[in-house]
C-alpha cells in the first residue's frame, strides 16, 4: 500500500486503510474515503490534491492525503 499523496495525477487505487485518530477517519469517511472505494488523483496543487471518489471531487491537504493508503 502507498499513501494517496504519493499517487501520480491520473492514477487510481483502492482504499485499503485509513490511519489517524477516530475523528480524522470519520471526517474522511464523510467525504467518501472508505475502505474498498476506488479513488483517482485528479490534480495536485501546492502540496494539496484533488481526488475523485464516489462520483465526487474532493480536495485534501497533503497531511490528510498521506493518511489514506491505497493498493
Q: Where would I find each of the regions flagged by the language model?
A:
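Compact, glycine-rich, soluble single-domain proteins
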Residues: 1-71
Amino acid at each position: 500500500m502507498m499513501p494517496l499523496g504519493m499517487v501520480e495525477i491520473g492514477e487510481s487505487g483502492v482504499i485499503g486503510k485509513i490511519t489517524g485518530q477516530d475523528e480524522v477517519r470519520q471526517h474522511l469517511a464523510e467525504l467518501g474515503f472508505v475502505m474498498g472505494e476506488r479513488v483517482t488523483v485528479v490534480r495536485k496543487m501546492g502540496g494539496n490534491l484533488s481526488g475523485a471518489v464516489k462520483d465526487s471531487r474532493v480536495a485534501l491537504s497533503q497531511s490528510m492525503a498521506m493518511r489514506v493508503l491505497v493498493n
